[in-house]
């Protein structure tokens, strides 16, 4: 079968035509891939950075954001049928640890990821445990369903705390941060401020409903950034601080600024992964009585339920998809993603 694979321990991802068909077992589902989306993780693997070098076995079929159709299933599978449109949870868990047995599978200590630790979705076919497969409602397109993984990250991050009537600060306007703007606006946030250095994505954030989108590339240090944020807060009528912070960047200065401008009793969801150690003002956390929650992946499957329910209720995520390409043009897709001048890039395997 055709697949995109990491074949060498160097930058790049390569198309192959002779990847072996995956074999499915008693509790597995065989999925014919229709659409995939390129994730930031895929860029790390493409670029072969330090994280990838330490994590990714080679050779490896990459990719974990997908939509497809069930074409076969094991004899023990009753939850889906051949012909069902599906996406799937890319985190595979042990099912036996304390958290898994308590229904908190997103906290499994032994989590592994498709396209990272085991063969992934950038292929014509994917095998996945039936328990990880999620049926796509008829009203949701394959394109949108292929972005369920990052959208689920945004849902999990944003809905960890109440947003209705709250002032929300989002640091990082990548695709997940942009989705968080949509979610916060849909949930009735009062003011939404987002920060980034990417002018293209900051304009997308404004189009998505952000009250203010701040270009932080203009500021030399965290003190200047905090001063500018306080000016923005004053201009939009904020007399205290932000009630909820959604940290999507993993950047030290962004996190420090967020702590500075949070209201007392504020709540922070932290999704962004840092390339190194982070230094923060511990006193600000203590004396402001802040609540911090680390986010990894999606709650299985409450996040998926909330996500599809909100889409069916009218939350419009279509604008997050800015480019659609045939799989044969995957190199162009990766170049577009690397440029940052995009939202989500979809690769079509069905034509």
UniProtKB/Swiss-Prot annotation:
Localisation: Cytoplasm
Pathway terms, separated by semicolons: Amino-acid degradation; L-threonine degradation via oxydo-reductase pathway; glycine from L-threonine: step 1/2
UniProt record, GO biological process: L-threonine catabolic process to glycine
Cofactor note: Binds 2 Zn(2+) ions per subunit.
Enzyme class: oxidoreductase
Binding site for NAD(+): 176, 196, 201, 271-273, 295-296
Cellular component, GO annotation: cytoplasm
UniProt xrefs under PANTHER family: L-THREONINE 3-DEHYDROGENASE
Entry similarity comment: Belongs to the zinc-containing alcohol dehydrogenase family.
Name of the molecule in the record: L-threonine 3-dehydrogenase
Organism: Francisella philomiragia subsp. philomiragia (strain ATCC 25017 / CCUG 19701 / FSC 153 / O#319-036)
């Amino acid at each position: 079968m055709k697949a995109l694979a990491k074949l060498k321990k160097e930058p790049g991802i390569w198309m192959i035509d002779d990847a072996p068909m995956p074999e499915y077992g008693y509790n597995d589902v065989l999925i014919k891939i229709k659409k995939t989306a390129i994730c930031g993780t895929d860029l790390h693997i493409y670029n072969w950075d330090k994280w990838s070098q330490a994590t990714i076995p080679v050779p490896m079929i990459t990719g974990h954001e997908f939509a497809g159709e069930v074409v076969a299933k094991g004899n023990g599978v009753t939850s889906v049928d051949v012909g069902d449109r599906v996406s799937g949870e890319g985190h595979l868990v042990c099912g036996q640890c304390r958290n898994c047995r308590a229904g908190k599978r997103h906290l499994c200590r032994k989590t592994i990821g498709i396209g990272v630790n085991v063969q992934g979705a950038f292929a014509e076919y994917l095998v996945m445990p039936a328990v990880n497969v999620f049926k796509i409602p008829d009203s949701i397109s394959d394109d949108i369903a292929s972005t369920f993984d990052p959208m689920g990250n945004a849902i999990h991050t944003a809905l960890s705390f109440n947003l209705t009537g709250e002032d929300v600060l989002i640091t990082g306007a990548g695709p997940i941060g942009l989705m968080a703007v949509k979610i916060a606006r849909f949930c009735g946030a009062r003011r939404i401020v987002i920060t980034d250095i990417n002018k293209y994505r900051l304009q997308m954030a404004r189009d998505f409903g952000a009250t203010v989108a701040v270009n932080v590339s203009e500021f030399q240090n965290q003190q200047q950034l905090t001063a500018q944020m306080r000016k923005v807060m004053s201009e939009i009528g904020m007399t205290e601080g932000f009630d909820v912070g959604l940290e999507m960047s993993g950047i030290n200065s962004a996190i420090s600024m967020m702590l500075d401008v949070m209201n007392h009793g504020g709540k922070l969801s932290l999704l962004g992964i840092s390339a190194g150690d982070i230094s923060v003002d511990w006193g600000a956390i203590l004396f402001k009585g802040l609540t911090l929650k680390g986010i990894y992946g999606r709650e299985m499957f409450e996040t998926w339920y909330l996500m599809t329910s909100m889409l069916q209720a009218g939350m419009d995520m279509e604008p997050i998809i800015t480019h659609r390409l045939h799989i044969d043009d995957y190199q162009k897709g990766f170049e577009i993603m690397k440029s940052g001048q995009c939202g989500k890039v979809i690769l079509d395997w069905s034509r």
